[in-house]
A protein has these predicted regions:
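Hydrophobic alpha-helical transmembrane segments in multi-pass membrane proteins
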Residues: 102, 106, 110, 114, ...
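Mid-bilayer segments of alpha-helical transmembrane spans in multi-pass integral membrane proteins
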Residues: 138-147, 166-183, 203-211
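Juxtamembrane helix-boundary/capping and inter-helix hinge elements in multi-pass membrane proteins
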Residues: 165, 226-230, 341-349
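Helical hairpin unit composed of two closely spaced alpha helices linked by a short loop
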Residues: 305-346
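Gly/Ser-rich, low-complexity
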Residues: 1-17, 23-133, 147-161, 166, ...
Length: 388
């Protein structure tokens, strides 16, 4: 009898141990499948797929070709920086060709017009013939103005595409932020970035492009006909554009910093109070409910981090060619300005100085907007961490 009872208890112990092991082994599988299903559900509801599909192909294709995906946060953190550096090298080599070719063409024209100075008899100081200098200045301006005008159009189109990324991505991230409990931060960032995106679009289309083209036209005329004395008007236009840029960036930075600090504090207090209430006043399962809320917030944070990091990389990919192109054109203008000074061709020297000012202003405007967009995404990502 005792032997039968011991056998019975032994089978019961084996069954209980097997049940316990299956529970422990099955829990990670269930947890992983639940996290994946929850992630896919929130990916569809948040509009993240539509946002990724709306990104410009020139910003997304270099990332997808390197195996980067917004759903794979590990690859973004491990390979994102390497992909940016590789693309930067390719973009630099690709954008170097046209400025170098135009530099050689304009330098050839300048040297051809400066030959009379080099061949003049010793002891005599003859000026370059007026007609030859005028013709050389006109040819050099035409060779340099055409690609610079096209560059202005391309940069402004890039800024408009970057505005689309900002206006399309921030609402998605703010919606995820609001769903994870950060209601104040979600609503605040959405309003501020929407206003900034609309202002940047208005400045680009209605102010930046016309002012830069007018500046180039007036500076060209003033250098061809120095007696018109239009340099003061050119300097005033450029100064107005730069002060507008400084004011817009300073105002946006101040508003974003203030709203970020206030909303983070308000959301932190609200979330901690809610967790404390659930843990204290819900009997037995209050702590489990609070832990479940933390898990959901962490999953939402992972979703937000993947989308935001991919958007930042797309912005950098989009703006890098413009950065390199503007920098190379500025360098080309500086070299040509120095060559004009050596050949004593003052008309062309003033023109290339004006072109350099325009390109530097364009580069500053592009860098400022890229900084605004990247900072906006970074602040949304850092709000509440991954699951505060």
């Amino acid at each position: 009898m005792d032997r039968k009872r011991s056998r019975k208890f032994r089978w019961i112990r084996i069954f209980l141990w097997g049940l316990l092991l299956s529970a422990f082994l099955g829990q990670p599988v269930f947890s992983q499948s639940w996290e994946e299903s929850f992630y896919e559900e929130q990916w569809g509801k948040s509009g993240a797929g539509e946002f990724i599909d709306s990104l410009p192909p020139e910003a997304v294709d270099p990332l997808t070709q390197r195996g980067l995906s917004p759903k794979d946060g590990a690859s973004l953190s491990a390979e994102g920086a390497n992909s940016i550096w590789q693309y930067a090298g390719d973009a630099l080599l690709e954008n170097m060709r046209e400025p170098f070719q135009v530099f050689l063409q304009v330098a050839g024209v300048l040297l051809l017009c400066g030959i009379p100075l080099a061949l003049q008899p010793g002891g005599k100081k003859l000026r370059t013939p007026e007609a030859m200098e005028f013709l050389g200045a006109l040819c050099g301006m035409l060779l340099f103005l055409a690609p610079v005008s096209l560059l202005i159009q391309n940069i402004c189109e890039t800024i408009r595409q970057g505005t689309g990324i900002l206006l399309g991505g921030i609402p998605v991230l703010c919606g995820i932020l609001t769903a994870s409990g950060h209601t104040v931060a979600g609503s605040t960032f959405s309003v501020v970035t929407a206003a900034a995106g609309n202002v940047v679009t208005l400045l680009t289309t209605s102010f930046l492009v016309p002012v830069l083209h007018v500046f180039l036209a007036i500076s060209s005329i003033s250098n061809l006909y120095p007696r018109m004395r239009l340099q003061v008007l050119c300097a005033s236009l450029l100064k107005a554009l730069r002060w507008t840029l400084v004011f817009a960036v300073s105002l946006y930075s101040a508003l974003l910093s203030m709203q970020s600090a206030l909303s983070s504090s308000a959301d932190a207090v609200t979330l901690k109070a809610a967790r404390l209430s659930v843990s204290s006043f819900v009997p037995v399962v209050g702590g489990a409910v609070s832990d479940a809320v933390s898990v959901v917030q962490a999953s939402m944070g992972v979703l937000r981090s993947g989308i935001g990091s991919f958007a930042i990389l797309a912005l950098l990919i989009l703006f890098l060619p413009g950065f390199f192109s503007c920098t190379l054109w500025v360098a080309s203008g500086c070299l040509l300005e120095g060559l004009c000074g050596m050949l004593e061709m003052n008309r062309m020297k003033g023109f290339f100085h004006s072109c350099r000012d325009v390109l530097q202003t364009l580069l500053a405007f592009q860098a400022s907007f890229c900084m605004i967009a990247v900072t906006s995404f970074a602040l949304v990502l850092s709000s509440g961490g991954t699951g505060a």
